[in-house]
Amino acid sequence: FDRFAHCLETGLYRAGQMITPSPFLTAFNFNDFAIQRYAPGSQGISVHRDGKRYQHIVVIATLAGNSRLFAANSRDGLQRRMINDRPGRIVLLSAPLFAGRKSEIARPLHGVDRVHGGRLSLGLRIKTP
């Protein structure tokens, strides 16, 4: 697992350095890991923003299952944009400090619904003290 996290850290940071200006002000290390398991038929998780304590970037890797990860324009979730998170794909969400973003715009509203047959995902984040 440490190798996986290190490869993501290194790869994302290097890719960011190829962009002018780089979206990453400094190198980073993932230090917060969460496994999310949704049972078959689960309601998922309602529209939310990741906590302010997370910075730079949030990585979500869906390992198994079928569901809908979506971004929303508002907490009511009426306008949803599907994010392809089928197993094997990695989703990147911005967090404060990514590309100089601050405040709420840095933390996109998102949620999970339409869980069919369960869902297993891994989240990697950079938590500030």
Where are these regions (language model features)?
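A generic local secondary-structure boundary/capping motif
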Residues: 23, 49-50, 58-59, 80-82, ...
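A short, acidic/glycine-rich surface segment
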Residues: 43-47, 106-109
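Short, conserved beta-strand element in jelly-roll/cupin
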Residues: 37-40, 51-68
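Short solvent-exposed loop/turn micro-motifs enriched in small/polar/acidic residues
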Residues: 28, 53-54, 76, 105
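Signature of the catalytic double-stranded beta-helix
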Residues: 1-40
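Catalytic core of Fe(II)/2-oxoglutarate
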Residues: 70-129
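Short Pro/Gly-enriched beta-strand edge/turn motifs at strand-loop
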Residues: 41-44, 94
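Extracellular structured ligand-interaction cores
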Residues: 30-32, 58, 66, 119
